[in-house]
Design a protein with these regions (language model features):
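Transmembrane beta-strands of outer-membrane beta-barrel pores
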Residues: 5-9, 77-81, 122, 142-148, ...
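Long, internal scaffold/assembly segments composed of regular secondary structure
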Residues: 1-100
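Short loop/turn motifs that connect adjacent beta-strands in outer-membrane beta-barrel proteins
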Residues: 59-69, 123-136, 177-185, 208-214
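Residues on the lipid-exposed face of transmembrane beta-strands in outer-membrane beta-barrel proteins
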Residues: 1, 53-57, 73, 116-120, ...
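Flexible, surface-exposed loop regions and adjacent strand-edge segments
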Residues: 16-24, 87-94, 154-162, 204, ...
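Residues that define the transmembrane beta-barrel architecture of outer-membrane proteins
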Residues: 47-51, 108-114, 164-170, 195-199, ...
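Transmembrane beta-strands of outer-membrane beta-barrel proteins
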Residues: 1, 12, 69-73, 116, ...
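Extracellular loop and loop/strand-boundary signature of outer-membrane beta-barrel proteins
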Residues: 37-42, 97-107, 156-161, 187-189, ...
Length: 236
């Protein structure tokens, strides 16, 4: 368990804040209220309170079934976390525009984040004919972000894609080694239930007797309809 008071290291948690407003027109037009108002904004990273904890627990049997899996987890509670908020749909045919309820474009909400992971090694002999005792490493993770007292229109500073009350991300990874662990194949899969997926197959070469050198070839494949969510941003 722990407590952090400081700046959030995640750039995606930054928000745009209004620092001032001014009239964008001639003095007479501003006086008559016939000139548009321009809002000056700044991207800020405020100090935050974070209550966090983690655990790591090996599980040998589940209901008398040997699973030999390590279960691990992390949890963080962020009170009064700032979010940008807009009105959807926006005025004048825009996808989003300023929310009259929040003229500064920022709202604070208590937020819970957690991750739950399962790791294990398993033998797949037919994929290792040269060394049937060389194991495969398997890892599955679930990430969730929950916004309490959620309001419609909350979105990240970087896009006009709304953040739901509960956001989820699933990942799976499998890897092993061949020829004395000089050839290391690896596959990473990610799935966002809101509309995106990614697949990253990779193969690495580690010269014998020199573990400090590693040469990797990584593929990147993306799909789905929502390119503004977490996985979709990498496709752009």
């Amino acid at each position: 368990l722990g407590y952090i008071w400081g700046f959030n290291p995640l750039s995606t948690d930054m928000v745009f804040k209004v620092t001032g407003r001014e009239c964008a027109g001639a003095a007479i037009a501003c006086t008559l209220g016939r000139a548009p108002t321009v809002a000056n904004m700044r991207l800020v990273n405020d100090r935050m309170n974070v209550f966090a904890g983690q655990f790591n627990y090996p599980v040998g049997d589940l209901m008398n079934i040997p699973i030999n899996t390590t279960m691990r987890g992390e949890v963080a509670f962020l009170p009064n976390k700032p979010y940008n908020i807009s009105m959807f749909p926006g005025a004048y045919g825009l996808r989003a525009s300023a929310n009259p309820k929040y003229p500064d474009g920022v709202v604070e909400k208590n937020t819970l984040r957690y991750a739950l992971g399962f790791d294990r090694t398993t033998l797949i002999p037919f994929l290792h004919p040269d060394d049937p005792w060389r194991a495969f490493s398997l890892s599955f993770q679930l990430f969730q972000n929950i916004i309490f007292d959620h309001e419609d229109g909350i979105h990240p500073f970087s896009s006009a894609s709304k953040i739901n009350r509960v956001s989820s991300l699933l990942t799976f990874r499998i890897g092993t080694g061949y020829l004395g662990d000089t050839i290391l194949p690896d596959v990473f899969l990610g799935y966002d239930p809101e509309g995106y997926w990614s697949a990253n197959p990779a193969i690495s070469y580690v010269p014998p007797g020199n573990e400090k050198i590693k040469i990797s070839l990584v593929g990147a494949f993306y799909g789905g309809h929502n390119k503004f969510k977490a996985l979709g941003l990498f496709a752009e």
